[in-house]
Amino acid sequence: MTTAAAAAGRSGGAGETTSKSTTSTTTVVTTTSDTAARRAETRAAAYWSRHIRSFRAGTRRWLTVMHGRPVGSSRSLAAHSVHGLRLLARTWRHREHAAWWRATHPPHLHAWNCIHHYEGSWTDSGGPYWGGLQMDLSFQSTYGGWLLRHKGTADHWSPLEQIWVAVRAAHSRGFSPWPTTARSCGMY
């Protein structure tokens, strides 16, 4: 039983360890350099997959701040090569940065901070109005329903979440919830 694979296995190159497994008439030769390369590729794929999951989570977190509800899930990373994972990680890093930038710079941020200055504290939990922009329960349920269900009233939301809920309200009904303060803060 002299085959080319068996002859290569007997010769044993420098730095190679061979393991043979014979089944009937087939001989399989595996070298340590092959398994080391596969291990390195597996480690690289795991590294980039971790980064992609982290960037996706950051992107989802910032989109949740802006939209008031979580966004849908993403597809699996299993079918990508290491090079493809590296490119995908770069794409998700850019998406996360863009989502962070947009979420932390809502429209009229200076004016919303001005309204907060005159209306109340970000953690104001008194009476019929909650939060720094003084939102009542019907306002919170209409424009921040997911946040109200999952985090409670507006005094438990972050200032950015409160501002984005107010931005959604301003898009649909203007600045009527803050008539005097919005005018004095230059929003009319």
Show the residue positions of the predicted features:
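Intrinsically disordered, low-complexity
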Residues: 2-117, 183-188
